[in-house]
Structure formats: C-alpha cells, structure tokens
Amino acid sequence: MKKTLADFNFFYSAFSLATNYVTRCHYRNIVERGSENIPWGEHFIIAPCHQNALMDPMLILQSFHSYKNPVVFLARADIFRKPAIRAILTWLRISPVYRIRDGRDQLGRNEEIFNTAREVVEKGVPLCLMAEGRHNDKHQLLPLVKGMFRIAGATQVELGDKPLYILPVGIDYDEYEKPMSSAVINCGKPIDIRAFVDMYKENPPVALNQMRDALTPALKGLMHHVDSTEHYDEEFAYCHLMTQATLEKLDLDNDTWGRFQARRHISLQMAQLTEEEREKCYAEGAAFADECRRKGVPLWFASKNLSSVQVGWTFVILVAFVALLSVSHLWGKWLISNLMVYLPTHLIPKYKIKDPQFRSSVNYGIRLVSQFLYTLVVAIIFFITQGFLAGLMISVFSILSARFMPLLFARLRDVYYYFRMII
C-alpha cells in the first residue's frame, strides 16, 4: 500500500531529530510561549505568520515536533518544478499549492491537494500553512490567503461534531539575514471552526471571510506588527530606541521575550497617538537608525543595552576557551578544521545570495549538510590516525561544537558591536 503524507515514516522522524538540533544551533535563543494552547490530540491546522523563508517552517518543526505525527506542510508550487527537488520535498512531508501565477490550468490541481490536506487533518496529523502565502521582509502581517480556510471549512463539514481548530502562531526574529539571532514563537488561543460551519454550508465565501477576519487580529496580537507602511522604518527604529525605557515601565526582564513584548507594546501605543505625536516619534526613530548605521551597529543590538560587565565575562570565556585548546594538540587541530564548517555557512550566503530574505535559509542548509560531512570525515581521519577513542571523542565534540562554536562567535560579535557603540 502506497504511503501518504499523513503516514508515519521512521526515517523522516529520525532525520527530523537532526534538523531540530541544527535549528537550535542556528539560533542564539529560541523562546517558545503559549505551548499550553496547542490542542494536542485534536484536529488542528497551524497558521503562522511568514517572516523568514525556510526558517519559519524549520522553527515550526522544532517547536511542534512529535515523533509519532510530524507536521505536514503546504508550500507554493514553483519550488517543486524540478523532479529531484519535488521528490525531496515530498519525502519531507511538503505538498505543493498552485497559485494564479503558476497558470490557470494548474489551479485545478489544487482540488486534489486540498483533498490530501483534508485527509491529513482528519487523521490527526498537524497541517501547517503559512497564513500570508508568501514571506515578508518586514515585521508586518500581509493579507491572509483563503486556501487554508477552504481546507478548514471542508474538513469541519467532514468531521461533523468533532472540533477542528486553527492555531494562530506569531513568529519574530531579532534579525532576518544572519544566524545566531534570537527567535520568538508565540502560540495563541485556537480558533474553533465549528463556529463557522453553518455559514460555510450556506455561503462558503462569506464563511471564508469570517474565518479570515477572526485569524487576522489573532495573528497581529501574537507578533510585532508595525502598522505603518509609509513610515515603517522609522517606527521600527523607534521601537528599538524605546525598548529599554519600556522594559522599565512595564517591569519586564531585559531578555528576548521581554524585548519582544516591549517592541510590540510600543507599536500598539503608537497606533493611539495623534498624527503630530507620531511624526515626532518617526523623527526620533529616523535619527536613531541613522546613528546606528553610522556606527555599523544593528538596531537589535543597540536596543539590548549590553553592559560592560557582560562584555568582560565574554572576554573571560573566550580567553579560557582558547587557553583550553592551546594545551591540547588534538583539540587545536579540531578547532582549525572546524572552520571548514563555519566559513562556508557565512561566506556563501553573504556573497552569493542576492535576496537577503534567503540568506539565513541558505546558511541553514549549508550548515546541515556540511556539519554532517565534517563530523563523518573528521571522525574517520582521527579514528585512523589517533585510534578509536580519539575518533569517538572528536565525533562527540564535533556535534557539540555545532552549538557552542557559533555561540562563541556570536559573543565575539557582541564585543565588536559594543566597542563600535562606545567609540
């Protein structure tokens, strides 16, 4: 019997353990909130905002990982054009969705795709669709596409009295392009589709609009949504300028979650200001952004208010690490060879990928492949030249280095930014 996307796949589940680890290694910090809202054991569709190309689904996989029922995704069809890529994506439990830009003759194929998606949800497997249909390079929610709501309405009809939920998920990043930023995954209250099923049976277009109207504010409340389009850059910069003051005002911790809450609060407050007051905020934000650009410091770092004590401890950690390696000829070789992984993951996206939105995703893909090959090759070399124990130890250290080496480089980057700010 042919397996479907909803069926259990042992090899995929084992592979996902590796990808989830690499996802953790890709970020300095991943903050998850609202996990109590996930309706495990029920039928549900995950509806995240789409902020950062491939990294959004990788964060969803990491946060919603279930060994028995990994998440199934729907993605735009244009990435499935090459047969080899299509085979890989299908194995990764990703199915295509066709849009008008793919050709009107292709739209008819969505009926089969939507039927498959409905079967996935009916079997109790989480289904994920990016609510906006395309990623955005700004902290703004784009208009939601209706494909998800068509699947939800038809599935709820099939389920009858059994509930189907749409789970809104907000995603936020300190920085889109580079690795070792911090990420926030914020799950909201699930939306019960039974509330719309009667209208769906009577007038589907109206029901689809009602579902969209329910999901849109839910998502905006879970992410940092900058409402202004014309003055986006100024408002976004102002949110970072006022982060520390807002942390003190709201008695929030100066950490990833606290700063995210502060920035979101500032945007909500700005929406209530008069036009004259907002213009003043925009001017302050523009001046702050100009100052950061002049010093070569990103907004997210400028808003952290890193202290000299933290910088001092970073120096201590770096010196201790180098000293530890210097007393061991074996680990010195390991450190040098580790650059074989670190350098390609940073240089190739920076100089070869023109679209900034895909640089982090390409970095992730290179890291996933190169780290596996590096660990395998180095383990074999050390096993042959140094013996079994050395080969085993270097394998373990290589896997661990995938996590703490980027953290060390990120700390070093913090020190660099700190001195750029005070000079």
Where are these regions (language model features)?
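Long, charge-rich alpha-helical interaction segments
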Residues: 213, 217-303
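Membrane-proximal, non-transmembrane alpha-helical segments
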Residues: 270-349
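Soluble catalytic domains of membrane acyltransferases
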Residues: 5-19, 23-206, 215, 321, ...
